[in-house]
Curated annotation (Swiss-Prot):
Pathway connected to this protein: Protein modification; protein ubiquitination
Entry GO MF terms: ubiquitin protein ligase activity
EC number(s) reported in the record: 2.3.2.26
Modified residues annotated as Phosphoserine in this record: 9
Pfam families reported in the protein's UniProt record: HECT (PF00632)
Name this polypeptide is given: Probable E3 ubiquitin-protein ligase HECTD2
Length: 776
């Protein structure tokens, strides 16, 4: 059985507003407005050939440019010109980017005469012109004879129509291949034909483009068979579409694919996922480049006016969504999800895109926020921060209005979430303060330690986070269990009457995101998947939260040994009941007491057998990751969402939430060197040169220890090393002393060591024997 591929429909919008319970009523109507999110560049290349002519501005003019007076194939015909319906501005046009269901497909009877095309009978399949071997032999002959006629005739015939494309590239031209499991396309032949195409003379390349135009003109009525889908599948892989001179044709190809019905998209998605990694990545990069160059063309005269091709980007985004869905169906994915990011979007007005997405509901106005997989995590962070800033301003403004209306003097403190805590009662004081000031959680955070002088310019806030996280995650505190094999924390399954401290951890993570603080927390990826299940707080309090579908792979991220044992159970070839002697009852230790739990009613009397072992593994995994910690995680979930009650959260993948909270694990020490500031040193000083020679030569584990020693975390903020504001200060002490770090300020105090050997020795000792909390 295949996995179903569904994309949200405009007719079934997602409810995407998140709010604290007291704010929820007022935002109910806003939630319904949001359009659905579809679940998922390089510069222009040179001309087709050295003799390539000027760029073509429109589809019809391109036809005129590439059509010779007479082709050898005299009985072939094509329309003299193409008339498309009037194109509205992109902000008014129904977005092709959204899922287009059967009812949205244009009815031929209801269409205008401009869009109608004659309904052709079922095609008679042409005879397959060549095999892969025949084609390769023709190409080899060209090298010796220089005669391209055979190759030219092949391209002329193959690309002239959809039936010819199927005849050439189907493994069996007469077979139906009406299955998602196999497109029926000979991928090796397609690759050989396209790899050769760019090395052919220009007239052959123009012949191919003319044939594609003819094919698209005939198929404007919409595909009727799987052979039509196969033709689209083949045409989309054409490397000629890397060139801006072909973008008019490429855009119409994308539009026809984008407007296919859901069932056809389902087939294409499963065919896409069976492409090689190389070919799949080429499709993605080509589409990203197309979007980038339409947004910021190097030569605007290359393209039609935006008002006449406003559908280009929505069409490309929809096809990208199909590829993104295909990528998500493969484990591991064909390419990293970050390869779908379009860095060009970092330079557009993302807040306008966000507000369009938020405010215009189902008015069919296109926004890139409907396709968050193309927006980088750095850009999403900007959206979240600006959205949170706007929320903070609105809350502060309301507080100011309330003060004035009561004839009270305004106080600057009303603009901040002011925390006053004692170091000796850090957890309890923090919990009390956050509980009392729930309405202020979205204000800018400022921390004061009772009995201590000091103005919080960011350092005290970071210190509060570091100390609080350090205490809560300590093994003696009992809230979280550290798993050495996986190097991560997980929720303790102990039962208690009050789970408020788990809520505190959730609030801390939310505050960290909104205040741009990177936390040294090690949760497994499945924690962030649960945190977005659902991504908004349900209006019905009876709906479970933090529950998601989990697998043995998720369990392996936390308890690899147990996951390995369950995998062995699933693959065991003997008699499971006799060899394992297990039942649907499991045991857990809580405060030194062993407790038993039935995975299903009467589980202690149900043996695990070869027939029910999959059910056992699924129930056991679900018990460990969902049911046994439900109350703990629910409190954690509500804490996080009480701060991050924003529609912007809908844009994030679980992996991106982790990066926002904990930072990225990818280190670039050269970037850190370029952005480092100095106090008492110059970057040309000998000690500084020694320092960077040593650090850049460190293995990755020591580089991570250095980062943890100086910043409190071995991860990098979303904005990169530059966002650390790393500083090296001169420590006027004996060179026998070790370096000192002030993690609150990302500062390293370095004595003026006289030799590289001495500096390296002292630095390794310092970073290897300290937890990095040089808090003074």
């Amino acid at each position: 059985m295949s996995e179903a591929v569904r994309v949200p429909s405009p007719a079934t919008p997602l409810v995407v507003a998140a709010a604290a319970p007291e704010e929820r009523k007022g935002k109910e109507s806003e939630r319904e407005k949001l359009p659905p999110i579809v679940s998922a560049g390089a510069g222009a290349t040179a001309g087709l050939d050295r003799g390539a002519k000027g760029q073509i501005s429109t589809f019809s003019s391109f036809i005129s440019a590439v059509s010779p007076k007479k082709e050898a194939a005299e009985n072939r015909s094509s329309p003299a010109h193409l008339v498309f319906p009037n194109i509205k501005n992109v902000r008014d046009q129904p977005p092709i980017c959204l899922d287009v269901r059967q009812k949205q497909r244009t009815s031929m009877d209801a269409s205008s005469s401009e869009m109608k095309a004659p309904v052709l009978p079922e095609p008679i399949h042409p005879i397959q012109p060549k095999t892969v071997k025949d084609f390769q032999e023709d190409v080899e002959k060209v090298k010796s004879s220089g005669d391209w006629k055979a190759v030219h005739d092949f391209y002329l015939t193959t690309f002239d129509s959809f039936p010819e494309l199927n005849a050439a590239f189907k493994k069996d031209a007469t077979a139906s291949f009406n299955t998602i499991e196999d497109s029926g396309i000979n991928a090796k032949f397609v690759n050989a034909v396209y790899d050769t195409l760019l090395n052919t003379p220009q007239d052959i390349q123009k012949t191919v483009l003319k044939g594609i135009i003819n094919s698209l003109l005939r198929e404007w009525k919409g595909p009727r068979t799987k052979d039509d889908l196969r033709a689209y599948f083949v045409l989309l892989q054409n490397p000629q579409f890397n060139n801006t001179s072909t973008y008019v044709i490429y855009a119409h190809l994308l539009r026809q694919i984008a407007t296919l019905v859901e069932a056809d998209h389902h087939f294409l998605v499963h065919w896409f996922k069976r492409l090689s990694q190389k070919r799949f990545k080429q499709l993605v990069e080509r589409l990203l480049q197309f979007i980038s160059l339409r947004l910021f063309p190097a030569k605007p005269e290359e393209f039609p006016p935006v008002t006449k091709c406003s559908w280009w980007i929505p069409s490309a985004a929809k096809v990208l969504a199909l590829l993104n869905t295909a990528n998500n169906l493969v484990h591991p994915p064909l390419i990293p999800y970050t390869d779908f990011y379009n860095s060009t979007l970092d330079h557009i007005d993302l807040m306008e895109e966000y507000h369009t997405w938020q405010n215009f509901g189902n008015s069919h106005r296109f926004s890139f926020c409907q396709y968050p997989f193309v927006i980088s995590v750095a850009a999403k962070k900007i959206i979240i921060q600006r959205d949170s800033e706007q929320q903070m301003i609105n809350i502060a403004r309301q507080s100011l209005v309330d003060k004035v209306s009561r004839r009270q003097r305004p106080d600057m403190n009303m603009l901040f979430l002011n925390m006053k805590v004692r170091r000796t009662h850090l957890v309890s004081d923090s919990l009390d303060e956050l509980t009392r000031k729930r309405a202020d959680l979205k204000k800018k955070l400022k921390v004061t330690f009772v009995g201590e002088a000091g103005l919080d310019m960011g350092g005290l806030t970071k210190e509060w986070f570091l100390l609080l996280i350090r205490q809560i995650f300590h093994p003696d505190y009992g809230m979280f269990t550290y798993h050495k094999d996986s190097h991560c924390h997980w929720f303790s399954s102990f039962k208690c009457d009050n789970y408020s401290e788990f809520r505190l951890v959730g609030i801390l993570m939310g505050l960290a995101v909104y205040n741009s603080i990177t936390l040294d927390i090690r949760f497994p990826p499945c924690c962030y998947k649960k945190l977005l299940s659902p991504p908004i707080i349900p209006s019905d309090q009876n709906i479970p939260v933090g529950i998601c579908s989990v697998t043995v792979d998720d369990l392996c991220q936390i308890m690899p040994e147990l996951a390995h044992g369950l995998s062995e159970l699933l693959s065991h070839e003997g008699n499971v009941e006799e060899d394992f002697y297990s039942t649907f009852q499991v045991f857990q230790e809580e405060f030194g007491i062993i407790k038993s739990y039935n995975l299903k009613p009467g589980g202690d009397k149900i043996s695990v057998t070869n027939q029910n072992r999959k059910e056992y593994v699924q129930l056991y995994t679900d018990f460990l990751l969902n049911k046994s910690i439900y109350k703990q995680f629910a409190a954690f979930y509500y804490g996080f969402h009480s701060v991050c009650a924003s529609n912007a959260l809908m844009l994030l993948r679980p992996e991106e939430v982790e990066i926002l909270v904990c930072g990225s694990p990818d280190l670039d020490m050269h970037a850190l060197q370029r952005s480092t500031q100095y106090d008492g040193y110059a970057k040309t000083d000998l000690t500084i040169k020694y320092f960077w020679d040593v650090v850049l030569g460190f293995p990755l584990d020591l580089q991570k220890k250095l980062l943890h020693f100086t910043t409190g975390s071995d991860r990098v903020p979303v904005g990169g090393m530059a966002d650390l504001n790393f500083k090296i200060s001169k420590n006027e002490t004996s060179t026998n002393c070790l370096p000192v770090a002030h993690t609150c300020f990302n500062q390293l105090c370095l004595p003026p060591y006289k030799s590289k050997k001495d500096l390296k020795q002292k630095l390794i000792i310092g970073i290897s024997n300290s937890e990095g909390f040089g808090l003074e």
